C-alpha cells in the first residue's frame, strides 16, 4: 500500500464513514489516525479500503472492497466460494500468497493443507463490518465494557417490538443467501458441496471477541481442506482481534468483580485472592480431560444473535475432541464444578445467583415426543456490581453499566414445549431480564439499555439459538435499572434501617403459539441501586470506621471479620488471639432476672461424664481457620458435649474448605459455659471434702478418748495390783486368823519391818473406807435433793394435764455456779407442738457422727418450713451471747411511753380481746420464756445452726398436730402478755379478704435491710398471731448476733400511711450490768409509702417493739386510738441459745 500524507489520510478516513450526526468525541474512532500521526515511519500502517469503481478492482491484487466498509470483514463459510467483502466470492485457495494489508481483518494468506487426516470443524464467530454511517459503539477507552447495542433504525419497530416479534425480526435477512458476484467480475471456480450458510447479520451487530482456539496439535486428527481453510481463517481472525484488543487501554476506574476463567476449573490465582481476570483473558486448555472446560468454539449452522436493538455476544462450545461419543458433554454439566470453584471460594467476592420460581419451569420434548433432560443454565454478573461492606449488599450505580453472561447447555434437540394445554411446537428461545423488589417479588422493575449515542431505551428480550449438545454463551451489556431503590440516604453516617433492595432476574423463555413459557430462571442477591450522583453518598472508607465520642477511639457499625470476609458474629477471628489484659463479662445483678441457685451435684455429674481428649486439626480446616495444623490441642468433642450440655454447643452453618470440601452444620463449643460447670463441680467437691474432714476429726477425737480410757484402765489395773495387792492380802488374812497365831507367820519376815508395815496398812485402809462411805452418803443426799427440786420445778412449769416434762439436766445447768466474768449459758430448748410429750435422748446432728447426745424435749408433730433466724456477725469467730433466765419482776423504762407496759393486743380468747394491763410472770415460769414454738415440731441438737424460734412468754401454746390428745380449753391467762389472732398468709391479704367498706391501713411488705431478711407470715407463730388490725411477729435472734447491734426495719405500704413507734418493752433483767431500754420521743411518726425505723438488738433475752399504722396524719398511741382505723404491729425478738 502506498504511503499517504495527513490530508489524504483524513480525507480517506472521513470518506469511509457517514459522519452526519455522529461526530461526537465519544463516537469517533480516531485510533488509526492517532497511530498514523504518532508514527514517524508509517509505511506499515494499513487503512481500510476506500470505495472505488468496480472496474478498478483487480482480482490478483486482492478482493474488492465493499462500499462503505471499514475495519473487519465478514468471513464467508468454507466452501461457499470467494466473495468480495461481504457478498463477493473469495479467490480459490492458493499457497504462498503474501499477507495483504487490506486482508488483515480476516482475509489472510491461504494456509498450507494439513495432512494429518480429518478432525472436528472449528467455526469462527462471525464479525459484522462497520456499516456506513455508524461508528464502533464502544469508545476506545472502555475496552472492559460490553459492546454497544445494534441499532434499529425503524422507530415503529422500536415501539412495537414484543417477544412475539423477536422470533421474526430480521428472519428474511438472516436466511437470505449471499448475492451473486457482479457480472463484470470473473466467476469463481466450481465450489465444493456447499455447507449451511451463515446468516447475514444486520449491519449494526457486533460480536465480542472470544479467546483464541487451542494450537493445531490439539485438534486431533487432520482436517479436510475446506475445514482446514476455515480453521486457519479463524485462527488469523482471533489473533488479529486479540492484538487489536490489547492495544486498547483499559479503563482505570472499573472494578473487576468476576472472573472469566473456564467455568469448571479453579484458578490458583483465585485461591490466593489475586486480581480477577477480565472477559476475554487467554486461558490455556487444561492437560487433563477430566477438568477440561467447554471450548468456546462456534458450531456449524445458523447463528441467531437477536433483534437489531439488542447487544449480545453469543458463543457455543462444542464437545472436546477427547470426549467419548455417546457420553454427555462436560460443558453441559459444568454447574457442579463451578459451584465447587469460584462460587464457594471465600476470597472471591461476587454476586450470587439462585434458581427462581422452579415450580413454573416448563419441560422440553424432542421430535419423538420424548422428554429432554433439564438444560444447564448459569448466570454470571461480569461487571457493574460492587459489594459494600457497610451496607452488606451489592451496590449498582444507576449511571454505570452492568453486564451479565448466561451459559445455556442444551441436551438433545427440542421441538416442543409442555404447557398446561399440552405440547406446543417451539418458535424460538429468548432471554428476558427484569428486576424485582425484595419486599414484593411481584413488582417488576424495568431494565434499560444504553445506546451508542448515550441514550437509553427499554431493554427487549434477546433471541438466542440453542443448538443441541452444545453450550451457548450469551453476553448482554450496557444495562441499567430504570429506577433506584428507596431510602438510600444514610442516617448519621450509618446505613438506613429502612433501606430497600432490588434483585435481578435473568430468565430463559420459550415462545410457542404467541405464548411465553419459562424454561429456567435465576435471581441475584439483593442489590442497592443508587442515583447517578455519587456525591450523595459517603465513601465506604468513611462509613466503615468512624471516630467515636471518646478521644482516641473509633467504632465500626456492623460485624468485623479478621482473615475472613463472612463474619457471622460481632467479631470473627480466623487465627490466634493474644490478650494481655482480661476479658470482662457482664454480671451485674441489676441487669439479670430469673436468678436461680444451681444444683452443684448435677454439675459434678455432668463434668464427670465429659471426655477430655488430645487432638489436632485437619490441615484443610487449619488453613481456612488460620491456625497451625501441627500444634496439639486438648479439649472436648462438640457432639459429646451436646448430649451432656446442649446449651454449650452452637451450630454455625456450613464451613467450606479451600479444597472444596464442606462440613455441614459446623459445631462450636462455648468454653465459658463449661468453665462455669467446672466451678459448680469444684464447689460440690469442696462440700464433700469438708464433710470428710469433719468425719476424720470426729474419728480422731474418739480415737484420743478411747486411748485415754485405755490408759486409765491400765493405770487402775496396775495401781490396784501393785500398791494394794500385798496389803489387802495381809489385811484379809489378819482378820480371819487369831492374833496369837500370827507370830509364826511373821517369823519368816524381818522383825523390825513387819509390825510397822501392818500398822500403816491397816490405818490407811480404814481411812479410805470411811472416806468412801462419807462420799457415797453425800452423793445419795445430793441426788435425792436434786430429784425433789426437779419434781417441784416440774409442778410449777407443767400444766394441770401434765403435758410437759422438764429435763433434769436443764435444772442442773441452772443451779451450776457460773464464772462471773464469763457468759451465761442457758439450756437448749427444742421447738414443740403442745400435746403429750415424751423424754428421749436426741442424737440428731448436722450429719456429723460422734456428737455427744443431748437431752431434748420433743413431740410428734407435722413438719413445716424452718424459720430464718436473725444472724449477723461482723467479726470471726463470733462470740456466743446468751442471756440467763429472769429472776426478778419485769423491768420497763417509765420514759418509753405513756404507760409502763404496752397495750396488749387482743387475745385469741374472746374474753381477752380488749386492751388491758399485762400481768407479770412468776419467777418459776422459766421454761415458758424460752420455749420454741413451731408448727413443724422439729428438734435441733447442739450442733444445729438453724434453730427454731423460741416462743414469747405471752403466747398461748397452740394445739399441734400431735398423735396424742390435745386440750382445746388450755390457756395461760396469768402469763399472757397479749392475745394472738389466727395466722394469715400475708398482712396485705387481710384487707382483701375481709371485704369491709373502711379497711384499716396496713403494710404490704416488711424486711430488715442489713441482711435483706423479709418478715412474712411465717413468723406469725402460733396460729392466729396475725389477723386484721393486729400482727405479732416472733423473730428469733441467733446466739452469734452481738448486743447493741443497730438494724433498720423497712415497712412498705401500697398507700400513704403514718407509722409511729408506740413502745419498747421487755419483761426481763438485762443480760449485762448497766443495760437499759432505749429512750425515744413518743409519738414520732413517719408518713408515706416507705418507712425505715432504727431497731437495736438490746441486752435482753426478749424484747418487743410496738408500731402502729394509721391513716395519714392520724398517728396516736393512746388506747382510744383503737376506735380509729389502725393496725398494730408487734415485733417480738428473742435470743436463741445453744
From Swiss-Prot:
Residues 67-88, 329-339, 891-900 have a biased composition (Low complexity). The keyword Acetylation applies. The record marks 586-587 as: Cleavage. Residues 587-696 form the Peptidase S74 domain. Belongs to the MRF family. Residues 721-733, 961-974, 987-999 have a biased composition (Polar residues). One of its GO terms (cellular component) is Golgi apparatus. The chain crosses the membrane at residues 769-789. Its EC number is 3.4.-.-. This is Myelin regulatory factor. It comes from Mus musculus (Mouse). Keywords: Acetylation, Activator, Autocatalytic cleavage, Coiled coil, Cytoplasm, Differentiation, DNA-binding, Endoplasmic reticulum, Glycoprotein, Hydrolase, Membrane, Nucleus, Protease, Transcription, Transcription regulation, Transmembrane, Transmembrane helix. Residues 1-768 are cytoplasmic. GO terms for biological process: central nervous system myelin maintenance; central nervous system myelination; oligodendrocyte development; oligodendrocyte differentiation; positive regulation of DNA-templated transcription; positive regulation of myelination; positive regulation of oligodendrocyte differentiation; protein autoprocessing. Residues 790-1138 are lumenal. Residues 178-198, 286-302 have a biased composition (Pro residues). Disruption phenotype: Embryos die around 12.5 dpc. Conditional knockout mice in which Mrf is lacking within the oligodendrocyte lineage display severe deficits in myelin gene expression and premyelinating oligodendrocytes fail to myelinate. These mice display severe neurological abnormalities and die because of seizures during the third postnatal week. Changing residue 592 to H/R/M: Prevents autocatalytic cleavage and generation of Myelin regulatory factor, N-terminal part. Signal peptide: none annotated. The keyword Lyase does not apply. A motif (Nuclear localization signal) lies at residues 254-257, 491-494. Residues 250-541 bind DNA.
Amino acid at each position: 500500500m502506498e504511503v499517504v500524507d495527513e490530508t489524504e489520510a483524513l480525507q480517506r478516513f472521513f470518506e469511509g464513514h457517514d459522519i452526519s450526526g455522529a461526530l461526537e468525541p465519544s463516537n469517533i474512532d480516531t485510533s488509526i489516525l492517532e497511530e498514523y500521526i504518532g508514527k514517524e515511519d508509517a509505511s506499515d500502517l494499513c487503512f481500510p479500503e476506500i470505495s472505488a469503481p468496480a472496474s478498478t478492482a483487480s482480482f490478483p491484487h486482492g478482493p474488492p472492497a465493499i462500499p462503505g466498509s471499514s475495519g473487519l470483514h465478514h468471513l464467508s463459510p468454507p466452501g461457499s466460494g470467494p466473495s468480495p467483502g461481504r457478498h463477493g466470492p473469495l479467490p480459490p485457495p492458493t499457497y504462498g500468497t503474501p499477507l495483504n494489508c487490506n486482508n488483515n481483518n480476516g482475509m489472510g494468506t491461504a494456509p498450507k493443507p494439513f495432512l494429518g487426516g480429518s478432525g472436528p470443524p472449528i467455526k469462527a464467530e462471525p464479525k459484522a463490518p462497520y456499516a456506513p454511517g455508524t461508528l464502533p459503539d464502544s469508545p476506545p477507552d472502555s475496552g472492559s465494557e460490553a459492546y454497544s447495542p445494534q441499532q434499529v433504525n425503524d422507530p415503529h419497530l422500536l415501539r412495537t417490538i414484543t417477544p412475539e416479534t423477536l422470533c421474526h425480526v430480521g428472519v428474511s435477512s438472516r436466511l437470505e443467501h449471499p448475492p451473486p458476484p457482479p457480472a463484470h467480475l470473473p466467476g469463481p471456480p466450481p465450489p465444493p458441496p456447499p455447507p449451511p450458510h451463515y446468516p447475514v447479520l444486520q449491519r449494526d451487530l457486533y460480536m465480542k471477541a472470544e479467546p483464541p482456539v487451542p494450537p493445531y496439535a490439539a485438534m486431533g486428527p487432520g482436517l479436510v481442506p475446506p475445514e482446514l481453510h476455515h480453521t486457519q481463517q479463524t485462527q488469523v481472525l482471533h489473533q488479529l482481534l486479540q492484538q487489536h484488543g490489547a492495544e486498547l487501554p483499559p479503563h482505570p476506574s472499573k472494578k473487576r468483580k468476576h472472573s472469566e476463567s473456564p467455568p469448571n476449573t479453579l484458578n490458583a490465582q483465585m485461591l490466593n485472592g489475586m486480581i480477577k481476570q477480565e472477559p476475554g483473558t487467554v486461558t490455556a486448555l487444561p492437560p487433563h480431560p477430566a477438568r477440561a472446560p467447554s471450548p468456546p468454539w462456534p458450531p456449524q449452522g445458523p447463528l441467531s444473535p437477536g433483534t437489531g436493538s439488542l447487544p449480545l455476544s453469543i458463543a457455543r462450545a462444542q464437545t472436546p475432541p477427547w470426549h467419548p461419543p455417546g457420553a454427555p458433554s462436560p460443558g453441559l454439566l459444568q454447574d457442579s464444578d463451578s459451584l465447587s470453584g469460584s462460587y464457594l471460594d471465600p476470597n472471591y467476592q461476587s454476586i450470587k445467583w439462585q434458581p427462581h420460581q422452579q415450580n413454573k419451569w416448563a419441560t422440553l420434548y424432542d421430535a419423538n415426543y420424548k422428554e429432554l433432560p433439564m438444560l444447564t443454565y448459569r448466570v454470571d454478573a461480569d461487571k457493574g456490581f460492587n459489594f459494600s461492606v457497610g451496607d452488606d449488599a451489592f451496590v449498582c450505580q444507576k449511571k454505570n453499566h452492568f453486564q451479565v453472561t448466561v451459559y445455556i447447555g442444551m441436551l438433545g434437540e427440542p421441538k416442543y414445549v409442555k404447557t398446561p394445554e399440552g405440547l406446543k411446537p417451539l418458535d424460538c428461545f429468548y432471554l428476558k431480564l427484569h428486576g424485582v423488589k425484595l419486599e414484593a417479588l411481584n413488582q417488576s422493575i424495568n431494565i434499560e439499555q444504553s445506546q451508542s449515542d448515550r441514550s437509553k431505551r427499554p431493554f427487549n428480550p434477546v433471541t438466542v439459538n440453542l443448538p443441541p449438545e452444545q453450550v451457548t454463551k450469551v453476553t448482554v451489556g450496557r444495562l441499567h435499572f430504570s429506577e433506584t431503590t428507596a431510602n438510600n440516604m444514610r442516617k448519621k453516617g450509618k446505613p438506613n434501617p429502612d433501606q430497600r433492595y432490588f434483585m435481578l432476574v435473568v430468565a430463559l423463555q420459550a415462545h410457542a403459539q404467541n405464548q411465553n413459557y419459562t424454561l429456567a430462571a435465576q435471581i441475584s442477591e439483593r442489590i442497592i441501586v443508587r442515583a447517578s450522583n455519587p456525591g450523595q453518598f459517603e465513601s465506604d472508607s468513611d462509613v466503615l470506621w468512624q471516630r467515636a465520642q471518646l478521644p482516641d477511639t473509633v467504632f465500626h457499625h456492623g460485624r468485623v471479620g479478621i482473615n475472613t470476609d463472612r463474619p457471622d458474629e460481632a467479631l470473627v477471628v480466623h487465627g490466634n488471639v493474644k490478650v494481655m489484659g482480661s476479658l470482662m463479662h457482664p454480671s451485674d445483678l441489676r441487669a439479670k432476672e430469673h436468678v436461680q441457685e444451681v444444683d452443684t451435684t448435677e454439675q459434678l455429674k455432668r463434668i464427670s461424664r465429659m471426655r477430655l481428649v488430645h487432638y489436632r486439626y485437619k490441615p484443610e480446616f487449619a488453613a481456612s481457620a488460620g491456625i497451625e495444623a501441627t500444634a496439639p490441642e486438648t479439649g472436648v468433642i462438640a457432639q459429646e458435649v451436646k448430649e451432656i450440655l446442649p446449651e454449650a454447643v452452637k451450630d454455625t452453618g456450613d464451613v467450606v474448605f479451600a479444597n472444596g470440601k464442606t462440613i455441614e452444620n459446623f459445631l462450636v463449643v462455648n468454653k465459658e459455659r463449661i468453665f462455669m460447670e467446672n466451678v459448680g463441680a469444684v464447689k460440690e467437691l469442696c462440700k464433700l471434702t469438708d464433710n470428710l474432714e469433719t468425719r476424720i476429726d470426729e474419728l480422731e477425737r474418739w480415737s484420743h478418748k478411747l486411748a485415754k480410757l485405755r490408759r486409765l484402765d491400765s493405770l487402775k489395773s496396775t495401781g490396784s495390783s501393785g500398791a494394794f495387792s500385798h496389803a489387802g492380802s495381809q489385811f484379809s488374812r489378819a482378820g480371819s486368823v487369831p492374833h496369837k497365831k500370827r507370830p509364826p507367820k511373821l517369823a519368816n519376815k524381818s522383825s523390825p519391818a513387819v509390825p510397822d508395815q501392818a500398822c500403816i496398812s491397816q490405818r490407811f485402809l480404814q481411812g479410805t473406807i470411811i472416806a468412801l462411805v462419807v462420799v457415797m452418803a453425800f452423793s445419795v443426799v445430793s441426788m435425792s435433793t436434786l430429784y425433789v427440786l426437779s419434781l417441784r420445778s416440774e409442778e410449777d412449769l407443767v400444766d394441770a394435764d401434765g403435758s410437759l416434762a422438764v429435763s433434769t439436766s436443764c435444772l442442773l445447768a441452772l443451779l451450776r455456779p457460773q464464772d462471773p466474768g464469763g457468759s451465761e449459758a442457758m439450756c437448749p430448748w427444742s421447738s414443740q407442738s403442745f400435746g403429750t410429750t415424751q423424754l428421749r435422748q436426741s442424737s440428731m446432728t448436722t450429719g456429723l457422727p460422734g456428737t455427744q447426745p443431748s437431752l431434748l424435749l420433743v413431740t410428734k408433730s407435722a413438719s413445716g418450713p424452718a424459720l430464718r433466724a436473725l444472724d449477723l456477725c461482723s467479726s470471726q469467730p463470733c462470740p456466743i451471747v446468751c442471756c440467763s433466765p429472769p429472776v426478778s419482776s419485769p423491768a420497763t423504762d417509765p420514759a418509753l411511753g405513756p404507760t409502763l407496759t404496752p397495750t396488749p393486743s387482743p387475745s385469741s380468747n374472746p374474753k381477752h380481746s380488749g386492751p388491758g394491763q399485762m400481768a407479770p410472770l412468776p419467777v418459776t415460769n422459766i421454761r415458758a420464756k424460752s420455749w420454741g414454738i413451731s408448727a413443724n415440731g422439729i428438734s435441733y441438737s447442739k450442733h444445729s445452726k438453724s434453730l427454731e424460734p423460741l416462743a414469747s412468754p405471752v403466747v398461748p401454746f397452740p394445739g399441734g398436730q400431735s398423735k396424742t390428745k390435745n386440750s382445746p380449753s388450755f390457756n395461760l391467762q396469768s402469763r399472757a402478755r397479749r392475745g394472738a389472732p389466727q395466722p394469715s398468709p400475708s398482712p396485705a391479704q387481710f384487707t382483701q379478704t375481709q371485704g369491709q367498706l373502711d379497711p384499716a391501713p396496713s403494710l404490704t411488705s416488711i424486711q430488715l435491710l442489713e441482711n435483706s431478711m423479709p418478715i412474712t407470715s411465717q413468723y406469725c407463730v402460733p396460729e392466729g398471731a396475725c389477723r386484721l388490725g393486729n400482727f405479732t411477729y416472733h423473730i428469733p435472734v441467733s446466739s452469734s448476733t452481738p448486743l447493741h447491734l443497730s438494724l433498720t426495719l423497712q415497712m412498705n405500704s401500697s398507700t400513704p400511711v403514718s407509722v409511729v413507734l408506740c413502745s419498747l418493752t421487755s419483761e426481763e433483767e438485762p443480760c449485762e450490768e448497766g443495760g437499759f431500754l432505749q429512750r425515744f420521743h413518743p409519738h414520732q411518726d413517719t408518713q408515706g409509702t416507705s418507712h425505715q425505723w432504727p431497731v437495736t438488738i438490746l441486752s435482753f433475752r426478749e424484747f418487743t417493739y410496738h408500731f402502729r399504722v394509721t391513716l395519714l396524719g392520724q398517728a396516736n398511741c393512746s388506747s382510744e386510738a383503737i376506735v380509729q382505723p389502725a393496725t398494730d404491729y408487734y415485733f417480738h425478738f428473742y435470743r436463741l441459745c445453744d
